[in-house]
């Protein structure tokens, strides 16, 4: 049986670390002038995929 293909959009959005899956923050693409600098700084940092979504993301990535 051939290998499962990974979802290419998921491959571009998620990075797999040692034990967790990292993701970027939303709300950073446009209309940034009204958002405070503190919020923009916080949105810059990477987040981890929530435990309820890990199984679905792993399936998309073919893990």
From Swiss-Prot:
GO terms for cellular component: cytosolic large ribosomal subunit. PROSITE patterns: RIBOSOMAL_L35 (PS00936). InterPro entries: Ribosomal_bL35, Ribosomal_bL35-like, Ribosomal_bL35_CS, Ribosomal_bL35_sf. Keywords: Ribonucleoprotein, Ribosomal protein. SUPFAM superfamilies: L35p-like. Disulfide bonds: none annotated. GO terms for molecular function: structural constituent of ribosome. GO terms for biological process: translation. Belongs to the bacterial ribosomal protein bL35 family. HAMAP family: Ribosomal_bL35. This is Large ribosomal subunit protein bL35. It comes from Campylobacter jejuni subsp. jejuni serotype O:23/36 (strain 81-176).
């Amino acid at each position: 049986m051939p290998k499962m293909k990974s979802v290419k959009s998921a491959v571009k959005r998620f990075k797999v670390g040692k034990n967790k899956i990292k993701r970027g923050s939303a709300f950073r693409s446009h209309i940034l002038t009204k958002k405070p600098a503190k919020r923009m700084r916080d949105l810059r940092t990477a987040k981890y995929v929530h435990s309820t979504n890990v199984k679905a993301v792993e399936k998309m990535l073919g893990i």
